[in-house]
A protein has these predicted regions:
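GHKL-family ATPase ATP-binding module
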Residues: 1-24, 31, 53-55, 63-65, ...
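Conserved short strand/loop->alpha-helix "switch" segment adjacent to the catalytic nucleotide/phosphoryl-transfer site
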Residues: 36-55
Length: 652
């Protein structure tokens, strides 16, 4: 639903100088201590850091695309889990870098903070999370080979653990039309805890990058299986297609995506948005293709523009009565999926991790462009404006009802136990770091759980009624649900804008359900609630899933507990099946107090799974929760059929 106006290529202003030689490479500091402290440069040496190496090299290629010189990027996972990233950009410069007295290619791969993005003429805008790129990948790789096609010649150079192993060499010629860079590297097993790349993790990030870089084609190839696996991401519609993708499984309230684009304050702004029938807002913000999960000035500008523009239109067109209050930003954003993407020459971020944009001009630019173009859109599309207004008014009424219920909850003090749910068996300690709460499904397990707990540090909250599916409910229904009210009050943090992590009463929230399909469904309902209204609990590592055993094997008066069919078979092999008495637990209620305490509750002997969430995963998580908990049956069926092969024990 783009706004019609004269065609103009706004990207032209942001394309860099065509001069891209050694003099455009600036050196800010030497490559030091990367191998000693890799976490400082790539976040961690876990599987997350492993994948970050790929992103660093890909981001360099994307910078070429943003500058207008690259159309294709191919990422290949080889059989040995080495990676090749190839682009058709200008090719990294190979001539002499005067200050360093060595080739620019060597400088890029051996000097930290060396690259065309720091001088201003090589790149107008660039991404890359830490701006360290190629040199850090080189330092953390057991080998790295780079091939450059440039000016009719092919050059190669090789490295190992940051050191040159083969000097730059011209190995042949290419046509003038052939150009680009190919980087092949193998992460160093001495550095990384994991060495195996996950296709789906790379797929999610590369798809996002393709959405954000209109017309860039990114191909992901996996050579590790007998049958080659390939996926290509190419989106002519850019972020408009991103919004449609994120709205999969939801009912859009109007057919086309609203799109605003323009340039102001030397900042290129793109915004795409569409309302759906859900009750949560999903807004994702990016600066030079970098995800800014904490928002910042570009998000503030958008929210200001949306709220003021919509209220002004609603007043002028009598969609709101004079006696009615203005719609709040939250009301207007209910069910909104939105992508905000800005391109800035020298973005200022708050904090080291670039999670929040601080550039003040971005607020002015986004606010101005969205205000002007959204006003025009609403005037041209009164039917869509009416649909948006009706949804916002419904949200306003629901929020008012929810506020009354919330105020009742707020008046009760969690500190002295007043107002805590009557069914909560609380612990005596007030030290939140030592305390944990078990959310227990059903009455049958409640007795053993209460008796088997440590009453000093372990609380038990039973779920007796049905947990509301919050994916399909407004705030007023959420506050009216007894089970959810009980959890909100017991946890102590509040939800949404009231959330305060410092008031958390238990540092471990443990969801304890039966190990069957019904138990998994109840656990998913609870996780859906926490994810939507208290996501910080997951981000900060406070949410866990208990792992009750499936089997109790007794032989020679000794008990063995198996938590999976595979473990059950291994135990039988080890102790011998003859004379072994096997019982399968169908639910928590079938265990006696001692069994439940030993296998599922005692910190010394239990197994817990911590629920993790990375900010990079949020868009995919939103889609997964919508698929599993939304109204549409067909996407859910497709998801289960597609993922059933990854499930070892499918209880149907």
């Amino acid at each position: 639903m783009a706004i019609e106006r004269e065609e103009q290529d706004l990207n032209e202003q942001f394309h860099a100088s065509k001069e891209y030689g050694a003099d455009q490479i600036q050196i800010l500091e030497g490559l030091e201590a990367v191998r000693k402290r890799p976490g400082m440069y790539i976040g961690s040496t876990s599987v997350r850091g492993l994948h970050h190496l790929v992103y660093e090299i890909v981001d360099n290629s994307v910078d070429e695309a943003l500058a207008g010189f690259c159309d294709n990027i191919t990422v290949t996972i080889h059989k040995d889990n080495s990676i090749t990233v190839e682009d058709d950009g200008r090719g990294i410069p190979v001539d002499l870098q005067k200050k360093a007295g060595k080739s620019a290619l060597e400088v890029v791969f051996t000097v930290l903070h060396a690259g065309g993005k720091f001088g201003g003429s090589g790149y107008k805008v660039s991404g890359g999370l830490h701006g360290v790129g190629a040199s850090v990948v080189n330092a953390l790789s057991s080998f790295l080979d780079v091939t450059v096609c440039k000016d009719g010649k092919v050059y190669t150079m090789s490295f190992s653990k940051g050191k040159v192993t083969k000097e730059i060499e011209c190995i042949g010629t290419c046509t003038e039309e052939e150009h680009g860079t190919k980087v092949h590297f193998l992460p160093d097993a001495e550095i990384f805890e994991e060495s195996i790349y996950d296709f789906d993790t790379l797929k999610v990030r590369l798809r996002e990058t393709a959405f954000l870089t209109k017309n860039l084609r990114i191909k992901l190839v996996d050579e590790r299986e007998e049958e080659l696996r390939e996926m290509t991401f190419h989106y002519e519609g850019g972020i408009k297609e991103f919004v449609r993708y994120l709205n999969k499984g939801k009912e859009a309230l109007y057919p086309d995506v609203i799109y605003c684009e323009g340039e102001k304050e030397h900042i290129l702004v793109e915004v795409a948005m569409q309302h759906n029938d859900s009750y949560t807002e999903n807004i994702y913000t990016f600066v030079n293709n970098i995800n800014t999960p904490e928002g910042g000035t570009h998000l503030t500008g958008f929210k200001n523009a949306l709220t003021k523009t919509f209220n002004d239109y609603a007043r002028q067109n009598k969609l709101l009565k004079d006696s009615e209050p203005n719609l709040s930003g939250e009301d207007i954003r209910e069910g909104l999926t939105c992508i905000i993407s800005v391109k800035i020459e020298d973005p200022q971020f708050e904090g080291q991790t670039k999670q929040k944009l601080g550039t003040s001009e971005a607020q002015i630019a986004v606010q101005g462009i969205v205000s002007e173009q959204l006003t025009y859109f609403l005037e041209q599309n009164p039917a869509v404006a009416r649909v948006m207004c009706e949804k916002s008014i419904m949200a306003q009424r629901a929020r008012a009802a929810a506020r009354k219920a919330r105020d009742l909850t707020r008046r009760k003090s969690a500190l002295d136990g007043v107002g805590l749910p009557g069914k909560l068996a609380d612990c005596s300690s007030k030290d939140a770091e030592r305390c944990e709460i078990f959310i227990v499904e059903g009455d049958s397990a409640l007795g053993p759980a209460k008796e088997g707990r440590n009453p000093e540090t372990q609380a038990v909250l039973p779920l007796r009624g049905k947990v509301l599916n919050v994916q399909k409910a407004r705030l007023d229904r959420i506050y009216a649900n007894e089970e959810i009210k009980g959890m909100i009050t017991a946890f102590g943090t509040g939800i949404n804008e009231d959330f305060d992590l410092s008031k958390l009463r238990y540092h471990k929230i443990i969801i304890m359900t039966d190990a069957d399909v019904d138990g998994a469904h109840i656990a998913t309902l609870m996780l859906t609630f926490i994810y939507n209204f208290m996501p910080e609990l997951i981000k900060e590592g406070h949410v866990y899933l208990a792992q009750p055993p499936l089997f109790n094997i007794t032989k020679n008066k000794k008990h063995y507990y198996a938590y999976s069919d595979e473990e059950y078979q291994n135990i039988l092999k080890e102790i011998g099946a003859e004379g072994a008495d096997v019982s399968r637990f169908k639910g928590l209620g079938e265990m006696d107090t001692e069994e439940l305490a030993e296998t599922t509750m005692d910190p010394e002997t239990r197994t817990l799974l911590r629920v993790n969430m990375e900010e990079d995963d949020k868009a995919e998580l939103d889609i997964t929760f919508t698929t599993l908990m939304g109204d549409q049956v067909e996407p859910r069926r497709e998801f289960i059929e597609k993922n059933a092969r990854y499930v070892k024990n499918l209880d149907v």
